[in-house]
């Protein structure tokens, strides 16, 4: 006689769990009616794009480093579709200005802006189609969708179009331009998009509110240790020790999850990239130009990303499941 009651309780529990899981799995998309928001978006994009063009146009064509599209992708992936035109227009204008002032000049401004927007749109549309729960870094499957959209679709198309423009306007060959675009934009997308998404979704603030002082102290200590190891490897060591940062990187992935892993990748990209461009670090042993060494460094960072972020995403999925029990 008690079974119906138990079934009812079980059904109620399952519905409650499903509701909780749905709430956890579907972050609320941002929406703002402020006119200041697209202006701020465009200004951030312009500053990041201009710095990339000033610092990393080693061969007179494309920038070898590019992180501004990661900002646009994060904006699109965390906002409602009706807010996309504002961000797209703002970033398109910013891209055109940066190219005109610091890149290949006014003739390339419009086509390069269109290609930058196309890349971000492809990633956003593919992820919105195949990751309906909006939790892009929440599991290995959703992370794989993002990686395939960025590396296998968007930048194959965008690199081809950009290389055609560069080959017509400069002396840089189609093949070299294609590789410069692909490596620079893939590295920028992999490095910065996940942490920007977590920040824009409020996950960073939520982590600070929910975690205790002990956890925060551990996070600071581990990231400081990782930064110190990275500085030693890229600035002071005279031996090829590129494998050394991988151990603390994996440890951070297990202890701090996706937030810590994303922060560590940014630290690695920032310190290692600055050292490589400045002529320091183990990559100076490679023959070739600064551009060649930068591309090799981008490959190294991409492999580091693929080593730690899927692990962090899988652990994050398990934590959510245990939290529902």
Describe every region a protein language model picked out:
Residues 320-325:
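Sensory-domain boundary/capping and coupling elements
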């Amino acid at each position: 006689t008690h079974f119906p009651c138990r079934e009812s309780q079980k059904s109620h529990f399952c519905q409650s769990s499903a509701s909780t899981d749905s709430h956890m799995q579907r972050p609320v998309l941002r929406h703002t009616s402020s006119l200041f928001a697209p202006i701020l978006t465009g200004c951030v994009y312009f500053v990041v794009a201009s710095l990339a063009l000033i610092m990393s146009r080693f061969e007179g064509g494309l920038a070898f480093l590019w992180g501004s599209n990661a900002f646009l992708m994060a904006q699109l992936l965390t906002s409602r579709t009706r807010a996309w035109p504002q961000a797209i227009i703002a970033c398109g204008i910013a891209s055109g200005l940066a190219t005109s002032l610091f890149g290949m000049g006014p003739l390339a401004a419009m086509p390069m802006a269109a290609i930058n927007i196309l890349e971000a749109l492809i990633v956003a549309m593919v992820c919105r189609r195949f990751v309906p729960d909006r939790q892009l870094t929440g599991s290995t499957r959703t992370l794989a969708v993002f990686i395939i959209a960025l590396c296998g679709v968007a930048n194959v198309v965008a690199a081809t179009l950009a290389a055609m423009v560069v080959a017509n306007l400069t002396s840089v060959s189609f093949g070299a331009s294609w590789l410069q675009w692909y490596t620079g934009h893939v590295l920028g997308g992999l490095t910065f998009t996940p942490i920007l998404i977590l920040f824009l979704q409020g996950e960073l603030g939520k982590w600070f509110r929910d975690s205790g002082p002990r956890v925060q102290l551990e996070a600071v200590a581990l990231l400081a240790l990782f930064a110190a190891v990275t500085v030693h490897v890229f600035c002071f060591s005279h031996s090829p020790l590129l494998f050394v940062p991988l151990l603390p990187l994996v440890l951070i992935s297990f202890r701090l999850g996706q937030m810590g892993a994303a922060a560590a990748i940014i630290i690695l990209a920032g310190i290692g990239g600055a050292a490589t461009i400045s002529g320091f670090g183990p990559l100076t042993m490679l023959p070739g130009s600064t551009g060649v060494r930068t591309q090799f460094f981008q490959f190294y960072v991409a492999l580091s990303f693929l080593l730690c972020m899927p692990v962090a995403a899988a652990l994050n999925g398990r934590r959510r499941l245990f939290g529902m029990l």
